[in-house]
Amino acid sequence: MPGVSAHGLSCEERRQLAVDLTRVLALYRSILDAYIIEFFTDSLWGTLPHAWQEVLDGLNPPELATLLLGMPREGEEIRYRSVWPLTLLALKSTACALAFTRTPGFHTPSEFLENPSQSSRLTAPFRKHVKPKKQHEIRRLGELVKKLSDLTGCTQVVDVGSGQGHLSRFMSLGLGLMVKSLEGNKRLVARAQRLDQELLQALDKMEKRHPKMVQRSPRHRPHHVVQWVSPTTLCEELLLPLEMPGQSSTRLLLTGLHACGDLSVALLRHFCCCPEVVALASVGCCYMKLSDPGSYPLSQWVAGLPGHELPYRLREGACHALEDYAERLQKAGPGLQTHCFRAALEAVIRQVCPELRRPGVQGIPRVHELKIEEYVQQGLQRVGLDPQLPLDQAALQAHQAQENRVVAFFSLALLLAPLVETLILLDRMLYLQEQGFYAELLPIFSPELSPRNLVLVATKTPLGQAFSILETEDS
């Protein structure tokens, strides 16, 4: 899916993009605000223009992926079987034109061509206990942090929200960086320390077996600290330097791999407020967990725009995986019926218990093997209602017959969702810009592997042409 490159936009172009985004989101807010499980209870199909209904009603899932989402199969031509209304074509074009591009400088991650479970770019010890998605992420972000550290003269990297320490471990023991690793969950910290020791032992064995292949250099394991980081107050532990002989001053680089909700905002505020922090590389996620107000909007510019508000539902939608859903549409598998079944269940729940709205239904296993009435019965039991209630079979079959409409409406919302993410990240760039700093966004991960793939890179002095080094894939 094409889009606008965040890198290289002037300050004025960034402001204008924010204006355009707020206008478009206000125009289509009814689609973004909708809950797909209320498709039948709120007659969501009827909220679409009649001309849109006519066009979308005739599309099967692969056609929705190709024609609406603009994600055809490799080598597939985009051909419309009918004339689409200009308003729908305008929506599609606008959604593509205003969203930050999520396509990195490489297409298929070459590291997984030989084995989809093992990155060929990481040695076996660094792959152990790490899923393929995380292997890709720690390698790509770790290498970017290493380059950024070299460019800005950083003496120490602080990995905030480090979890089990996979990124910290790769940066310190794989790339030779001095790393402090902050994580609020003490059990995760204890596991990270065990994995550190396990990796050190594996590297020692490898060095003994292949002394010429392994670089002999001092190994600095990550320094793990149990520490919660608040989005509103400065964390002294984050700023404390590691004791290193011969070091006269501390220059910190903050990083976070999918720093959840307010944690990404905390990194920005520490970067802005603390002179010892000279660089930032942050990949955010879980936008629905942002405090409101306080964590969005951050910039004065976006705060002053009419229609800038992003309620919970919009921020939640921005966390969906567009590329993954497009692939599911292309395969047209039975799993696509889940939204339709859940919407049918919601309609039954409202009939039985009108005050019970959108209750959480814990995952019902093997939905694709169930009949719609079986799904509804299991769902009723999960929300504390009688699963043996008499069901209107004709109504359920009528709902199931609209499965493609449910999928089409959800696809429309997904088409718009990247605009919400773009506005959130653009607001962060504008905030840093208003503080007098320099910020860029780069698509760093393959979006098929890691949907939240935009890294916010910030520095206190301009990098100029040197910034292009961060965009390249190491050979």
Curated annotation (Swiss-Prot):
The principal location of this protein is membrane
Where in or outside the cell?
Answer: Membrane
A GO CC term attached to the entry = membrane
Q: Which residues form the signal peptide?
A: none
UniProt KW keywords? Coiled coil, Membrane, Transmembrane, Transmembrane helix
According to the UniProt entry, the coiled-coil residues are 185-210
User: Which residues span the membrane?
Assistant: 406-426
Task: Respond yes or no to whether keyword Transmembrane is given for this record.
Answer: yes
Task: Supply the InterPro entries for this chain.
Answer: Methyltranfer_dom (IPR025714), METTL25 (IPR052220), SAM-dependent_MTases_sf (IPR029063)
**Membrane topology type, per the record?**
Single-pass membrane protein
Q: Which family does it belong to?
A: Belongs to the METTL25 family.
UniProt-recorded name of the protein? Methyltransferase-like protein 25B
What species is given as this protein's source? Answer: Rattus norvegicus
